Amino acid sequence: MRKETLLVICFLTLVLGTVAVIWSYALPAFKPLNLGHAKSAVVSVGAARQERALNPGELASLNQWIETHRRGWGPLAKTAPSSGDAVVSVVTDQGASYRLILFTGLSGADWDNTVIVQAGPDAPFRVHDFKSSVFAPLRQIAEQGTYQRSAPP
């Protein structure tokens, strides 16, 4: 085998090996979220984190929203400005739990209409920002309860 051929083979092996390693880490981020059907949910809203259970209509709306928005979630690459304006804690039919952290624009305008999902206690955070019309069902769930809003900074 000639020296040039060996160098080309080594170079291709190095490049393809690097690509394979990168894709093995990146591929799980492209899988759609499979959160499961929500059996019950509690929303914590406002600075005081006042809790209330979701009624059956809100639960149906949440399940429909989750089912239609399984794709497009990416890893959380930067620190969120706060712990969210509302947190929806969900228990599925299988007994698993996950959290939806909603940013409605109160704690950071650039995080408006953003949702962070944590599919379990040790699961990584996944984030997605939405258009106002797509985020509207979640905003309605978050803002339906009465709570005292904190003063702007």
Task: Please tell me what each predicted stretch does.
Residues 2-153:
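Function-determining sites in protein domains
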